[in-house]
Swiss-Prot record:
InterPro entries: Leucine_aapep/pepB, Macro_dom-like, Peptidase_M17_C, Peptidase_M17_leu_NH2_pept, Peptidase_M17_N. One of its GO terms (biological process) is proteolysis. Mn(2+) 2 binds at D372, D452, E454. GO terms for cellular component: chloroplast; cytoplasm. This is Leucine aminopeptidase 2, chloroplastic. Homohexamer (dimer of homotrimers). SUPFAM superfamilies: Macro domain-like (SSF52949), Zn-dependent exopeptidases (SSF53187). It holds the Pfam family Peptidase_M17_N. Its EC number is 3.4.11.1, 3.4.11.5.
Length: 598
């Protein structure tokens, strides 16, 4: 991801050879040949694509034979740095059911009641005026009104309290504040689900029910969406990524009943959808949370292959190694990958619907930098956040999270290609240098004036590859620019597209997902700053309008006949307060695919 803190550090390449140059001859005679070979400069070349041939002791055959690493280099990589391995922690497994029962007769661990501030209004007799609360309070002998007053519960949004009330069919009552009004958005309903998870965790409950005090508070045409959002919010609220902690917390909640949302196949299908979607979001979050010494490009490819194996009735996986990427002339992608000891993996999952009758073909492309050091324009200085650059594969996490969810949902009538050019952007003697020129697979040449603007270089070849699949529409997602975070803040992703139709589709999908997007301009006049004197283009323009020029760069690698959208998600990929990934993008992508299915 390009950041303002990037700076050139060309002298780093020579540092590894300094000791050997100064060592006395007697010491040089004692050094093993491998150490001496590593200390010598690589043979001169017109490119910076890597030196697999040199590493194997052979003379180079020109830059096309030296673009990256080999399978032998991958095998020699050894175990994960620091011997870190994730613990086997199962994500929350919760069953949801919509029930038409009287809430006061429900039996289980905790009855969660969602209340507005107005629901808590009391009459002159100090009793609740709301029918649901009044009935429950009477059943409890006035304990509910007394306990809520003692806890100073006022029904404000986000407020919750758990009351122990023995002797009932339910062991506890949880009150969840909604604010002044009943929820009317997906985001608000997800928040209710998160509150259900919170009160259930505090009570270590294995079963829960959710009911609204204002029976008519949720609009009838919104109930199905609300039920799914509450279920999704509950699962995501229960999830805590403890794979890298010495102790993990157990999830007790196994059953949640939704009362007052109707019953039957339609609502049951919505609740299943919520569970399927949540599993994809959790998968995406866990990919981003994984450190770079564990989640290498090879491991990311393995995770993608596992999706294809698990849902083999609708998925196939193709993983391209370096040699195949050379054949496809992916010089832009391989240039970024050249410095890393971990070889790149180009990942292509293909979803074909049951029955194989697809009326539309879509592609979803994700940036897959499993770590971004910035390269020779190394990230340094305050605010560079180099320690967080494991999240530079957030676009690919959204892609594969959506793939996992869609493998379970199995939408008809649509074929979807999930494409990620996975690699690391590191620093070494084989690395891409500022000023190098790389050639993308569509033949366009790029002068690299900033090695920390690497994501767009990998996406260039990925977009060309996507267009070659004969797709109708492409969405790419990337943690691409700090400029977009400056413009839109940490919660909103920027979208760039010349297609009004595609913009409307994603806007409609985001209304259901609750994720926030803002359409940004593709100002063509800004392309002037992207022109090179020696190549077709440079990879970065000036500081002003950086997210726009980045999008204009990507546009050069998309066929004009294909509808295309770029999503810059550098802000919402990460939650600074929780110090964890958000799973952003998965829900909107799934909704978009469903809207394109028959």
């Amino acid at each position: 991801m390009a950041t303002a803190a990037s700076t050139s550090a060309a002298a780093v390449a020579a540092a590894s050879r300094l000791l050997v140059r100064r060592a006395p001859p007697r010491l040089l005679r004692r050094l093993p040949r491998a150490a001496l070979a590593a200390s010598r400069p690589s043979p001169p070349s017109s490119s910076s694509y890597g030196a697999a041939a040199v590493a194997l002791g052979r003379q180079p055959l020109g830059h096309r034979a030296r673009m990256g690493h080999t399978a032998a280099a991958a095998a020699a990589a050894g175990p994960a740095l620091g011997l870190t391995k994730p613990n086997a922690v199962e994500p929350p497994q919760v069953s949801f059911a919509a029930k038409d029962v009287e809430f006061s007769e429900w039996k289980g661990d905790i009855l969660a009641i969602a209340v507005t501030e107005n629901d808590l209004v009391k009459g002159s007799d100090s009793k609740f005026e709301n029918a649901v609360l009044k009935k429950l309070d009477g059943q409890l002998g006035g304990l509910l009104s007394e306990a809520s007053a003692e806890e100073d519960f006022t029904g404000k949004a986000g407020q919750s309290v758990v009351l122990r009330l023995p002797g009932q069919g339910f062991k506890r009552v949880g009150l969840i504040g909604l604010g002044q009004n009943a929820p009317s958005t997906t985001t608000a309903c997800k928040g209710i689900g998160e509150s259900v998870a919170s009160v259930a965790k505090s009570a270590q409950a294995s079963s829960a029910a959710i009911v609204f005090a204002s029976v008519g508070g949720i609009q009838e045409d919104f109930k199905l969406t609300a039920a799914a959002a509450i279920a999704s919010g509950t699962v995501l609220g229960l999830h805590e990524d403890s794979r890298y902690k010495s102790e993990s917390k157990k999830v007790h909640l196994k059953q949640v009943d939704l009362i007052g949302f109707g019953s039957g196949p339609e609502v049951d299908q919505k609740l299943k959808y919520a569970n399927d979607l949540s599993s994809g979001v959790i998968f995406g979050k866990e990919l981003v949370n994984s450190p770079a010494n564990v989640l290498t490009p090879a491991v990311l490819a393995e995770e993608a292959s596992n999706i294809a194996s698990t849902y083999s009735d609708v998925f196939t996986a193709t993983i391209l190694d370096v040699e195949k990427c050379k054949e496809l002339k992916m010089g832009s992608y391989l240039g970024v990958a050249a410095a890393s000891a971990n070889p790149p993996h180009f990942i292509h999952l293909c979803y074909k619907p049951p029955g194989g009758n697809a009326k539309r073909k879509l592609a979803i492309v994700g940036k897959g930098l499993t770590f971004d050091s910035g390269g020779y324009n190394i990230k340094t200085g305050p605010g560079c956040s180099i320690e967080l650059m494991k999240f530079d594969m957030g676009g690919s996490a959204a892609v594969f999270g959506a793939a996992k969810a869609l493998g379970q949902i199995k939408p008809p009538g649509v074929e979807v290609h999930f494409i990620v050019a996975a690699c690391e952007n590191m620093i070494s003697g084989t690395g891409m240098r500022p000023g190098d020129i790389v050639t993308a697979s569509n033949g366009k040449t790029i002068e690299v004036n900033n090695t920390d603007a690497e994501g767009r270089l990998t996406l260039a070849d990925a977009l060309v590859y996507a267009c070659n699949q004969g797709v109708d529409k492409i969405i790419d997602l990337a943690t691409l620019t700090g400029a977009c975070v400056v413009a839109l803040g940490p919660s909103i992703a920027g979208i760039f597209t010349p297609s009004d139709e595609l913009a409307k589709e994603v806007a409609a999908a985001s209304e259901i997902s609750g994720e926030k997007f803002w359409r940004m301009p593709l100002e063509e006049s800004y392309w002037e700053s992207m022109k090179s004197g020696v190549a077709d283009m440079v990879n970065t323009g000036g500081r002003q309008g950086g997210s726009i020029t980045a999008a204009l760069f990507l546009k050069q690698f998309v066929d004009e006949k294909v509808q295309w959208m770029h999503i810059d998600m550098a802000g919402p990929v990460w939650n600074d307060k929780k110090r964890a990934a958000t799973g952003f993008g998965v829900s909107t992508l799934v909704e978009w695919v469903l809207k394109n299915s028959s």
